Every structure is written in C-alpha cells, then in structure tokens.
C-alpha cells in the first residue's frame, strides 16, 4: 500500500506522443542551401526500422547460447497516410515516384519538441525515397499513400545543416 508521501511525490513517467515529432525533406537537394518542407499534412503514421544485420555465433563457451553482433544497419523511416495534393512535401515526394537513381536522393531530418516547447533535431541524413504509393484505397476515401525514406550512409545525430 502506498504511503501519503508516495502519493504526494508521484511523478508520472514522461512519454513522447508521435505528434511531438516532426520531419522535413529537402526539396532542392542539388542546391547549396537546403529548402526544407515539413512532412505533415496527410501523414498520420511514422515508423522507424533499423534493418539490422546480426551475426549470431554459438561459441563452445556459450553453453548453447549465442553471442550476437550487429554488423550493419540500413535505417528506414516509413511514412503513411492520405495523399494531399498541393502540399509541398507530398508533391515533392510523389513527384519522384517514376524517377530512378540519384533523382530520388535528397536530405531528411527529424525533430522532436519537448513539453517546454524546445525543438531538437534528432537526426539528419542523406536519403533515397523508395516504394512510393500515392494511388490506393476505396473509391469514397482519400487516396492512401506511403513512402520509405532510406538512409544513405550513417545518419548524423543532430542537425548536419545547422549554420
């Protein structure tokens, strides 16, 4: 049974709902200075996958249990939601769906805003836009859309483009 002091001093653990996160995409990747468009309108789901390469070894001294080594990762951010025509970020992304090679390469950064209103850039990366779908769903619904933002090389923790 908790004491009165336990009740008075209770602190609820902090959580960060996904709406505290934001993402931006560079719509002029070949320019000297990025032109950032906020990825927001229409997207209602974001998921991170590290896509790890794990080497698993069962050494004699492990008594039948493995030793795991993460030897590589291919980070991907998947965004999905509803297609919004006229939105700068979505028009840029889905305007690339029939492009090949370097024409799908751009820059990406993800941020988070804390309870005090301070925004911090968590990661920034060179990316390739993959597996885009912007025509999908039932006839009475707004078209479902999705895109995979795949990192090229290691991401930078922070804002690589900060002045």
Residue ranges and their predicted role:
Residues 1-2, 163:
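Glycine- and charge-rich intrinsically disordered segments
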Residues 2-84, 126-143:
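Solvent-exposed edge beta-strands and adjacent loop segments
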Residues 7, 11, 81, 103, ...:
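Short, intrinsically disordered low-complexity segments
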Residues 70, 99-105, 132, 150-153:
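Short, surface-exposed linear patches
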Residues 83-86, 154-156:
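Acidic glycine-/aspartate-rich tracts in secreted/extracellular proteins
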Residues 90-126:
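Short, acidic/charged, Gly/Pro-enriched secondary-structure junctions
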Residues 90-92, 157-163:
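Short, charged, solvent-exposed linker or helix-capping segments at domain edges/interfaces
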Residues 111-159:
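Short beta-strand and beta-hairpin "edge-sheet" elements
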């Amino acid at each position: 049974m908790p004491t009165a002091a336990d009740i008075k001093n209770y602190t609820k653990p902090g959580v960060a709902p996904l709406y505290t996160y934001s993402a931006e995409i560079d719509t002029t990747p070949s320019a000297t200075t990025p032109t950032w468009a906020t990825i927001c309108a229409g997207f209602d789901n974001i998921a991170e996958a590290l896509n790890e390469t794990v080497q698993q070894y069962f050494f004699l001294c492990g008594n039948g249990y493995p030793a795991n080594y993460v030897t590589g990762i291919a980070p991907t951010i998947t965004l999905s939601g509803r297609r919004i025509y006229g939105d700068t970020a979505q028009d840029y992304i889905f305007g690339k769906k029939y492009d090949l090679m370097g024409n799908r390469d751009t820059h990406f950064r993800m941020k988070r805003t804390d309870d005090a209103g301070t925004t911090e850039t968590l990661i920034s990366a060179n990316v390739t836009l993959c597996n885009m779908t912007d025509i999908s769903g039932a006839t009475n619904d707004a078209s479902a859309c999705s895109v995979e933002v795949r990192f090229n090389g290691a991401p930078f923790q922070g804002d690589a483009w900060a002045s």
